[in-house]
Amino acid sequence: MVAKDQKPILVKNSDEGLIIKKISKSFSGRPVVREVEFQFKCGEAIGLLGPNGSGKTTLFYTIIGLIKPDSGSIILDGEDITDLPIYKRSKNGIGYLPQEASIFRGLTVEDNIKAILEILEEDKQKVEEEIDHLLKEFDIDHLRRTPALSLSGGERRRVEIARCLASHPKYILLDEPFAGIDPIAVGEIRELVSHLKERGVGVLITDHNVRETLTLIDRAVLIHEGSVLIEGEPNDIVGNEDVRKVYLGDRFSI
């Protein structure tokens, strides 16, 4: 859980947002993503959803910088970042948490966060101050000297998010955050996403657990056969007949 008495460091955001503009991608001549467009701003949680083979994963990796689109552009606060590699996108404000554990298992919790901060900040006192703040904000101060290898799934995720926030991202992209975790950890993920929004961080989630995803996002973009089938609030998505036909089924509810 997130500490309630620790004020988060708010993101200095822009009104321009993250814009996905007519992104297309083909593999071996087969179109996978077809002129997809949507945008979101800091403080919003957006779900990128769709059936298997819809193109959503390719699109997600294109936004991260792992796949280069054939056409279209990705605009971050007015700057075209389409051709930037993933590490430069990180410097510009896009954080990424993969489905797989990304924690440095050989380090303690404190040193996991310090490893990022020492790259970004030369002032050792400021490094220590921010470590203290993040440890308290995410209620992991008692785990400060605990080896990362011994953390539970929920604890590990909190450390990974705290470490990601050490680079002061404006947006965080979460890949399958609900995969392979127990109900208690699901509740923690929901709380963490809410906390990121309070911080002013924009959150983009792609996950096969559509029910959990729809209950915590503001809007969803549903991809079908490489194109946007519908974009809207969760209730709009669930109530759409085409969505039920190709993705949710008639009995789905949230």
Give the location of each predicted region:
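The feature captures the beta-strand-to-loop junction immediately N-terminal to the Walker
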Residues: 49-51
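Helix-to-loop junction immediately C-terminal to a conserved catalytic motif
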Residues: 64
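Conserved ABC ATPase "signature" region
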Residues: 114, 125-143, 191-194
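Conserved ABC ATPase signature
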Residues: 147-151, 155
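Conserved catalytic motifs of ABC-family nucleotide-binding domains
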Residues: 168
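Catalytic Walker B motif of ABC-type/P-loop ATPase nucleotide-binding domains
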Residues: 172-176
